[in-house]
Every structure is written in structure tokens, then in C-alpha cells.
């Protein structure tokens, strides 16, 4: 499931990879600069599901119907959506969620379910009341006998407690899966199908429905379970945190305090997932160590304590739970109070440790604020999670897939001893296991029930710069200029002035070749060719030159670079070219640090000014052809062409442009007027002038260069 294109997680995606490499990237996109890896780890582990069931999310456990203990489908629950094979793995399914049976059918079913659950709950509540002494029931104040109403009130509250009293009520008896009062039509959480929800179910609901908690025991639970696409966003999308407004509002029926708690918990002060998500989908991972469910209740500890009661000391459990609930509930008495009967039910249920049934999230929220939750949350813990004192958790039935499981070794041990050393266990556990790897509840699922789902998508976006390949530094320009590339650009290569001029005269060929060959290092050609090349491939040349020369882009040929915004590496050429351009000028130019542009850390090549000038012209495509006037203008332009140069992203070329502007301006002014040869000569002159005015201009222009560069 981790393999394959991000969006084609479908049947076509490489299954073997998915199966074999759960760790492989779901989707990797690489470009020169960006590597995006999307890794999705989705682990679904359903202990409760009958082995025979294959794990297809579509066979959601609710779809499974009553058999799906996990889902706790009520017999009346709407028919399961047609099972969709896992094969269709889509990140976003067109319809992951079913509207469910028609509203009336749903309502009817829900009513039936509700009635049944209420009756059962009434009975349970009575029993619990008797057992627990009605510790919490009184707060409700509603006669439990009237379970229907009380239940109703509680249910609106979203107290799963009420809906699942039976669960706690009988230790031995597993609560009827179908009983969940979820169906309460009024209940917002009626269920994706039952809820009158126009939109896709919340992701939690979606997971539950999709069988995200696959009902079938994972065939290969060493591997993460298949990916469950989020519900489609065709309708208003309920996110996990959606308020169960209706429930909350109804919750007050059971008791105002609960709503307060709900407010806290369900009211999104704290976003809590449906308890079932914690219990079934998230499995142990959903339980936070010290705190019960992911929701963050200390319920865990309470749950831990509960296992003993689970043994069958329902009463004791009730006491424990009551104590826990009371402590929690007391701390959040409102929530607890709200759940008076519910609390009892919860206690008995918790004690029963019967497999949890899905419950409206609100319930959990109502269940309480953290503290309250602590007691309540246990309720959510599937029995299997509570290490049954009687039977050690099945080693392989750990909630987590083996590879990631904290480890069969320590895990079970820690959990196993839980009974006596509940807290200590947790402590030990924490110590021994890394927090992030250990299941949130240190309680190994003893039974088949429960679903373990880890759905983690990790998107790694690495921005890595892939430098362009460096070119050989020593390429000679074949254009007849036989200047050997000067490895150190700054070292003025005493090219013959005539040669330099010749190069300038043949700048197209020379520079093209130079730049093309990235022989920016060749001083004379570097300079002359640079001018030519500047036009042709300023950016590429600059890059190449910087690569070949090994200079910083800005350093190579600032003048060159300006032609192309991208020609930041041309600036690297700049120094090299100037070296070639004129040794004489080079010395002067060398004397002048090319700091003006701020582009080069090192001193500019001897002919940096001239080169920059040439490059500027090249970039501007305004090389003075035969017109010295034009050349002068160009020099002016080169000064003024900063804008265009500025366009270039590279500061270095900007600097060089600025420098060329300086150089050009002066050189142009003082440049010889002639044909192309003159232009070359002019370049040489410019170099000399550039050196003179370069310092001046440099000083003057440096700010500009810096500005441009920046």
C-alpha cells in the first residue's frame, strides 16, 4: 500500500511492492531540485474480525453486521455497503461512504436498535445500579427503569455508556454488537448511514465504515494494513472534529453537566475522535499512555485497573470504574453526572470488559473531560485491550503489527503484569519502549476484537540543488584565439593585445566557443568570447563558466552574466575573460577589486572592466558594431541597462553588469571608435578606462552593483 503512484493506489499499483515493502514510498516525485516522497503507512489490524474475512475496507465492520464484533453492527444496522475489494486503493474514493439505507429505513432500523439498546441498557443500568450502588445513576436522577428516556437523554448526550451498559453490565457477556443506540435518529452520530449527514462521514466514521478497521484478522499483520482512502469530499465533509451539535444539544437531556464536558471534549475545545476510532481503528495506538484514549483521558490507567474487575469482579470493576469514573467523573462531575446511569452502565460495562461497541463520539466526550474520560475511556477500551487477568494477551494478537509492535517481549510482559502494577507497568513500559512506538495503551489485545489502524502519511519534500556539471577548465576556443585558458581567472593571461582584440573581433566565434566550451577560463577568449558568448548563452555560459572556472557564478564574469538573468555563472567568466582581454588592463583591473558589483569575492580579472563591458554589450546585443557612438551609447546603456541586468536573478551577473556599466560608461566614453576591430580595441580601451573609471565607477557603482546584485 505504500507503493505506487500517489494517486494510483489502485489495483494496478504494484501490489508486490505494496505487500512486500510497506515501507516503500507511496509516491516519489523527483526533479532536479525537488524530491517529494509520500510515504503512507496504513496499518489495519482487526483482531475481532473473523479470520475468514478478507480484509477489505469495504467490508467495514459495520458492514459485517452483527458478526462484525468490531463494528458492533446492530442487527438492524443498514445493510452493509457492497463490499468493495481492497483492490481499489484510491487516495480519495469517489464515495467511500454510503448514504446508507433510505432515511426511513434507517430511521426504522435505528428506532429498533435504539429501542433494543435502550431496553438492554435499562436492564443493564438497573443491574449496574444495583451493583455500583447507583453511584452515578442518582445524578442522572432519572429512574433507570425508565431506560428509554434516560437512555434517550443520555444518548443524546452521546454517552455511549448508556448505549452500551450491557457491555459493562455483564462481565461474561459481550455486549450485543447491534445494540448500539447509535441509531438514535436524533443522534448526530447515528452513523454514516444513520446520521442524517449529507456529506461524507467524518474520517473516523469513514474508517469505521470502510472497515478501515478491517474485520478480518490481517492476513499478514506483520505488514501494515491496506490504506484506507479518506472519505470522498463530495458533500460537506465532516472532519474528525465535527461537532456533534445535535448530540450535544440532546446531551443536555441527560444532564447539563455533560454538555459542559462535551463542550470541553465534544465541544471541540478538545477535538476527540469517535471513541470507536480510538478503540477499533487506532487500536492500542489510540490509547494514550498515561491518558486513556487518544482523546487524552487518563482512562488508560483506569482501564488498566479494570482488567482485574474484568476478571469477573464486575462489582469490583464497577467499584474501580466507579472510583475511576467518580474520580474522573468527580473531577468532571458534570460529564459524569450526566452519565449517572451511564456511568453505572459504563462501570459495569467496563468491568465487563465486553468488547466495546462503537459509540457516538460525543459520548466519549461527554464521558468526560480528561479526568472523566479517564474513567470513561476504559469503556472504550475493547475488552481485548484490557489485559484479561485470566488470559494473558495472545502474543501475536498484539495490536500493532509485529515489526512496529513495541515488541512481543516487553510488550506483553509489561501489559501482562498490568493487573497488579498498572501504573508501574506503564512507567516501565514507557521507560522500556519509546513513547512513539508503544501502543498507546499498554494492554495487549487479548481477543480478536478491536481494530488496529495506523494511517500515517509522511510527505517528505526535499529541496536539493543539483549543481550543473562542471566543465573542463582548460578548453581552448577553437576560434583561432589560441589563448590558453588561465586556470586562475584572476591571473591576467597576457594574451596578445592583438589576439585579445582579434578575439574581440571574432568575439562571436571565440566567445561562443569559449563560453560554449565553458573555457571561460581562457583569459583573452574568456573576455572576448565572453562578450560574444554573453549574448548566446549568458545564463548557460555563466553557469558553465562558473562550473568550469570553479568560480562563484557572480565571480566569473559579472559582465557576462548580466546578459541573461540566469547567467549568474557568466559573472564567473567575467574575471577570466578580463584576464585574457588585456594583461595590461588586467593588471590595472586586477588592482581594482571587483568588489564594486559585490559579485566577486576575489579581485576582478585584469580586464574585468572591459570584459564586463563587452559582456554587457553582448547581453544587450548592442555591441558597438562599427559605430563608436553607438559604443558610447552602449556604454551608457550598459550603465543604464542595469534594469535588464537586474532582471537576471544572479546578483553576480548583476554586479558584473553594474561593473560593465561602469566600465562601459567610462570605456565607451573613452573607447576607440572603429569597426568591429575598433570595438575590440574599444573593449581594450574600455578595459584600461574601465580600470581607471572602474575604480571610480566601482566606487560609484558599487552600491548600484550591490543593489542590483541583491
From Swiss-Prot:
Residues 1-22, 62-195, 213-274, 324-375, 390-422, 469-508, 521-710 are annotated as: Disordered. Residues 469-491 have a biased composition (Polar residues). Residues 407-708 are annotated as: Interaction with CD2AP and NPHS1. The keyword Thylakoid does not apply. InterPro entries: Dendrin. It is a peripheral membrane protein. Residues 186-236 are annotated as: Interaction with MAGI2. Residues 113-131 are annotated as: Nuclear localization. Keywords: Cell membrane, Cell projection, Coiled coil, Cytoplasm, Endoplasmic reticulum, Membrane, Nucleus, Phosphoprotein, Postsynaptic cell membrane, Synapse. It is found in: Cell projection, Dendritic spine membrane; Cytoplasm; Endoplasmic reticulum membrane; Perikaryon. It comes from the Eukaryota. Its main location: membrane. Residues 341-435 are annotated as: Interaction with ACTN1. Residues 360-370 have a biased composition (Basic residues). The modification Phosphoserine is found at residue 388. One of its GO terms (biological process) is positive regulation of transcription by RNA polymerase II. One of its GO terms (cellular component) is presynapse. The keyword Coiled coil applies. Signal peptide: none annotated. The 81 and 89 kDa forms are detected by an antibody raised against a C-terminal peptide arguing for alternative N-terminal sequences. Forms a ternary complex with MAGI2 and SH3KBP1; recruits DDN to the cytoplasm. Interacts with MAGI1. Interacts with ACTN1 and may interact with WWC1. Interacts with the podocyte slit diaphragm proteins CD2AP, NPHS1 and NPHS2; the interaction with CD2AP and NPHS1 is direct. Promotes apoptosis of kidney glomerular podocytes. Podocytes are highly specialized cells essential to the ultrafiltration of blood, resulting in the extraction of urine and the retention of protein. This is Dendrin. It comes from Mus musculus (Mouse).
Amino acid at each position: 500500500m505504500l507503493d505506487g503512484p500517489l494517486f494510483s493506489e489502485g489495483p494496478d499499483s504494484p501490489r508486490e511492492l505494496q505487500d512486500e515493502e510497506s515501507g516503500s514510498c507511496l509516491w516519489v516525485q523527483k526533479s532536479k531540485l525537488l524530491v517529494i516522497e509520500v510515504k503512507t503507512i496504513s496499518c489495519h489490524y482487526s483482531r475481532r474480525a473473523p479470520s475468514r474475512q478478507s480484509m477489505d475496507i469495504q467490508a467495514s465492520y459495520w458492514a459485517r453486521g452483527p458478526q462484525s464484533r468490531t463494528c458492533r453492527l446492530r442487527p438492524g444496522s443498514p445493510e452493509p455497503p457492497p463490499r468493495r475489494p481492497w483492490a481499489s486503493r484510491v487516495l480519495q474514493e469517489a464515495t467511500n461512504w454510503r448514504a446508507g439505507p433510505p432515511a426511513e429505513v434507517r430511521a426504522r432500523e435505528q428506532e429498533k436498535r435504539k429501542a433494543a439498546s435502550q431496553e438492554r441498557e435499562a436492564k443493564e443500568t438497573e443491574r449496574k445500579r444495583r451493583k455500583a450502588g447507583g453511584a452515578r445513576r442518582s445524578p442522572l436522577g432519572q429512574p433507570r427503569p425508565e431506560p428509554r428516556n434516560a437512555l434517550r437523554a443520555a444518548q443524546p448526550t452521546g454517552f455511549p455508556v448508556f448505549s452500551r451498559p450491557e457491555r459493562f453490565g455483564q462481565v461474561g457477556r459481550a455486549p450485543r454488537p447491534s445494540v448500539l443506540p447509535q441509531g438514535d435518529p436524533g443522534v448526530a452520530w447515528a452513523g454514516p448511514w444513520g446520521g442524517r449527514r449529507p456529506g461524507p462521514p467524518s474520517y473516523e466514521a469513514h474508517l469505521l465504515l470502510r472497515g478501515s478497521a478491517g474485520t478480518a484478522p490481517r492476513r499478514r499483520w506483520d505488514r501494515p494494513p491496506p490504506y484506507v482512502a479518506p472519505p470522498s469530499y463530495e458533500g460537506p465533509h465532516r472532519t474528525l472534529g465535527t461537532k456533534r451539535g445535535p448530540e450535544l444539544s440532546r446531551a443536555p437531556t441527560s444532564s447539563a453537566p455533560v454538555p459542559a464536558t462535551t463542550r470541553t471534549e465534544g465541544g471541540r475545545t478538545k477535538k476527540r475522535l469517535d471513541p470507536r476510532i480510538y478503540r477499533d481503528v487506532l487500536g492500542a495506538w489510540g490509547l494514550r499512555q498515561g491518558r486513556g484514549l487518544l482523546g487524552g483521558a487518563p482512562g488508560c490507567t483506569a482501564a488498566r485497573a479494570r482488567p482485574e474487575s474484568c476478571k469477573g469482579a464486575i462489582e469490583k470493576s464497577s467499584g474501580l470504574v466507579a472510583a475511576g469514573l467518580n474520580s474522573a467523573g468527580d473531577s468532571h462531575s458534570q460529564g459524569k453526572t450526566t452519565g449517572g446511569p451511564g456511568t453505572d452502565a459504563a462501570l459495569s460495562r467496563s468491568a465487563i470488559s465486553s468488547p466495546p461497541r462503537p459509540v457516538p463520539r460525543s459520548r466519549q466526550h461527554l464521558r468526560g473531560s480528561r479526568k472523566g474520560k479517564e474513567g470513561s475511556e476504559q469503556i472504550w477500551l475493547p475488552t481485548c485491550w484490557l489485559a484479561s487477568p485470566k488470559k494473558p494477551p495472545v502474543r501475536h494478537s498484539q495490536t500493532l503489527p509485529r515489526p512496529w509492535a513495541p515488541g512481543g517481549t516487553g510488550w506483553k510482559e509489561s501489559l501482562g503484569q498490568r493487573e497488579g502494577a498498572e501504573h508501574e507497568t506503564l512507567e516501565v513500559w514507557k521507560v522500556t519502549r519509546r513513547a512513539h512506538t508503544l501502543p498507546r495503551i499498554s494492554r495487549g489485545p487479548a481477543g480478536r476484537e478491536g481494530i488496529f489502524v495506523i494511517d500515517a502519511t509522511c510527505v517528505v519534500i526535499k529541496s536539493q540543488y543539483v549543481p550543473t556539471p562542471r566543465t573542463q577548465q582548460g578548453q581552448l576556443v577553437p576560434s583561432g584565439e589560441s589563448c590558453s585558458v588561465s586556470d586562475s581567472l584572476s591571473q591576467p593571461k597576457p594574451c596578445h593585445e592583438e589576439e585579445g582584440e582579434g578575439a574581440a573581433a571574432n568575439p562571436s566565434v571565440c566567445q561562443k566557443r569559449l563560453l560554449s566550451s565553458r573555457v571561460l577560463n581562457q583569459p583573452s577568449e574568456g573576455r572576448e568570447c565572453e562578450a560574444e558568448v554573453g549574448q548566446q548563452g549568458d545564463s548557460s555560459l555563466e553557469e558553465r563558466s562558473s562550473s568550469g572556472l570553479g568560480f562563484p557564478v557572480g565571480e566569473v564574469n559579472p559582465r557576462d552574466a548580466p546578459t541573461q538573468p540566469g547567467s549568474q555563472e557568466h559573472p564567473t567568466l567575467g574575471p577570466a575573460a578580463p584576464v585574457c582581454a588585456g594583461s595590461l588592463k588586467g593588471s590595472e583591473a586586477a588592482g581594482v577589486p571587483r568588489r564594486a558589483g559585490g559579485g566577486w569575492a576575489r579581485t576582478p580579472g585584469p580586464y574585468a572592466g572591459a570584459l564586463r563591458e563587452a559582456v554587457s554589450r553582448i547581453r544587450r546585443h548592442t555591441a558597438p558594431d562599427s559605430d563608436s557612438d553607438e559604443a558610447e551609447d552602449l556604454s551608457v546603456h550598459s550603465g543604464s541597462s542595469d534594469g535588464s541586468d537586474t532582471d537576471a536573478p544572479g546578483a553576480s551577473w548583476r554586479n558584473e553588469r553594474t561593473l560593465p556599466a561602469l566600465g562601459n560608461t567610462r570605456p565607451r566614453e573613452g573607447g576607440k571608435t572603429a569597426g568591429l576591430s575598433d570595438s575590440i580595441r574599444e573593449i581594450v580601451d574600455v578595459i584600461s578606462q574601465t580600470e581607471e573609471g572602474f575604480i571610480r565607477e566601482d566606487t560609484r557603482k558599487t552600491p548600484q552593483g550591490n543593489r542590483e546584485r541583491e
